Amino acid sequence: MSDLHLLARQETKRRFIRQLDALNPDLVINTGDNFCSADSLQPLLDDMSGLLQRPGTFVFGSNDYLVPKFKNPFSYLLWGRSQQATEPVPELPHEELRQAFTSAGWLDLNDKSETLEVAGHRLTLRGTDDAHHDRDHYEEVAGPPDGEADLNIGVTHAPYLKILDAMVSDGMDIVFAGHTHGGQVCLPFTGAVSYTHLRAHET
């Protein structure tokens, strides 16, 4: 699950979150950007109460740390990322969110690696903190995959190539990310526009 960007008043979204537990997931992988305001934290945790009783892992996105501000989505096509706000942005209660998740038994993968058993299978996971705000330190978890694991999983919020390429090079079997909401810019019939198709790869 990713990019809920929850506000307490969003009843339709909250109902959707509450219904997710009925899917009976073996594992919840949360890739961040959970909420948009401090008063949304408790509603978020209430709505996720069923999921929080299941095995889970998480990394944070920018909107777990900071209140979101509108940015031009086309800036991704021009600069490879949206421009950062020039004015101070209020913080969100991210440590309270972290504490709630870890108290429920979820594994914090922000620049960390963890192993757990799910449905009789050994899973080894590594993750990064939010690359969109340069909080990522992949070097802290980099290295070869766990040869004894049934599945090696990479988790990050913003799918920046420096992280995706590193995880693939290190032998991750699958990588989960969020942030783009299906594409920052989507065109009729063709779908998401990727800046990697429009710009040369950075070297």
For every predicted segment, state its role.
Residues 3, 32-33, 61, 157, ...:
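Active-site glycine-centered loops adjacent to acidic/histidine catalytic or metal-binding residues
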Residues 196-203:
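Conserved small/polar residues in nucleotide/adenosyl-binding loops
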Residues 6, 35-36, 64, 160, ...:
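Short active-site segment of divalent metal-dependent hydrolases/proteases
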